[in-house]
């Protein structure tokens, strides 16, 4: 196990997984990461319920099983029409309680949520780790907080 995964596995570390591209692989289309153009996303979500058909990531499932759910959460930017599908996907496939799925409206709100989790769990920001697929988001979190930042690729060899 890598040093970073060992750190995430420590009981006091709060691990926060992004949903799209981390817990939910981009496999929306037939042999494609996308099933529609961005402008058609709302209609697609409302009519096709894509989160009901996405496969979970086995390496992350095993990690959460071993760590337990107490200090594991999911946090994702979501529009109101995406919330139910995202929450249901995480609860059904990763066993997290529904109140451990934090859905926010913007990347800035995600930063605020990470800070709030440090307070909620009475830990330093360093003990709150965001697992994310977007390097730009990881860079922003690293710049604005003291949180640990982890690219999802760290789980490829778990």
Tell where the protein language model's regions lie, with residue ranges.
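Alpha-helical substrate-recognition element adjacent to the catalytic core
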Residues: 2-89
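Residues at the starts of beta-strands that form the adenosine-phosphate
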Residues: 70-71, 127, 148
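Structural beta-sheet core signal
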Residues: 73-76, 130, 151
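A short, structured active-site edge motif that brings together acidic residues
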Residues: 75-80, 87, 93-112
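Short, aromatic/basic amphipathic alpha-helical patches
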Residues: 85-95, 116-120, 140-146
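Short hydrophobic/aromatic-enriched beta-strand-loop microsegments
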Residues: 99-101, 147-156
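Conserved Lys-Pro-Asp/Glu-containing loop-to-beta segment of HAD-superfamily phosphomonoesterases
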Residues: 109-136, 141
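Short glycine/proline-centered loop/turn elements that form peptide/ligand docking sites
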Residues: 134-140, 151-158
């Amino acid at each position: 196990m890598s040093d970073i995964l060992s750190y995430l596995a420590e009981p006091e570390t709060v691990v926060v997984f992004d949903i799209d591209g981390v817990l939910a692989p981009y496999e929306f289309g037939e042999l494609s990461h996308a099933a529609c153009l961005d402008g058609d996303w709302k209609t697609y979500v409302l009519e096709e319920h894509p989160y009901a058909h996405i496969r979970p990531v086995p390496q992350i499932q095993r990690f959460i099983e071993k760590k337990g759910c107490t200090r594991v959460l999911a946090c994702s930017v979501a529009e109101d029409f995406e919330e139910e599908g995202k929450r249901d996907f995480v609860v059904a496939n990763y066993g997290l309680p529904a109140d451990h799925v934090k859905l926010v409206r913007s990347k800035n709100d995600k930063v605020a949520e990470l800070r709030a989790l440090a307070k909620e769990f009475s830990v330093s920001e360093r003990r709150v780790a965001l697992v994310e697929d977007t390097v730009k988001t990881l860079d922003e979190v690293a710049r604005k907080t003291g949180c640990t930042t982890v690219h999802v690729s760290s789980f490829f060899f778990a």
